[in-house]
Design a protein with these regions (language model features):
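Metalloprotease/metallohydrolase-associated module, dominated by Zn2+-dependent proteases
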Residues: 1-60, 77-129
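Active-site recognition of the HExxH zinc-binding catalytic motif
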Residues: 64-76
Length: 129
């Protein structure tokens, strides 16, 4: 089943990547959707890895996860800084807003997502808003 979902999820991730790479005039970025516990962005190889469980959480959350990893590249390519700094969070919020998504954070990771009307559309298991 997961292999089928990876095949389903990858084109969605690639479309998001292409949109953001073109909008921000970034160097090419490769993207993989894998059966792994967490995702990452690797600057030297220009590779993003997205866990398939993020897709299984729903399309809005999957978009947010992919945009989170792409935010790392925008931040790095424009400021040469790594990690979850203020500029990174600004970029991530801007990208999410472009899809009508409003993040609610626990530190720098999502604990919930709302739509631009304020409706809760995703909540991490074990959390309240």
């Amino acid at each position: 089943m997961r292999a089928d979902k990876i095949i389903e999820a990858k084109p969605i991730a690639e479309q998001l990547r292409d949109l953001i790479v073109n909008k921000y005039n970034l160097d090419p970025i490769r993207i993989k959707v894998k059966d792994t516990q967490r995702g990452w962005a690797t600057y030297d190889t220009r590779l993003i890895s997205i866990p398939i469980w993020a897709y299984l959480e729903g399309l809005d959350y999957f978009r947010a996860y992919v945009l989170h990893e792409l935010s790392h590249f925008i931040n790095y390519d424009t400021t040469k800084t790594y990690g979850h700094c203020k500029n990174f969070l600004r970029i991530e919020k801007e990208l999410l807003a472009g899809f009508g998504l409003v993040p609610i954070y626990k530190r720098v990771y999502l604990k919930a997502l709302k739509n631009d009307k304020g409706d809760l559309i995703w909540l991490k298991r074990g959390y309240n808003v």
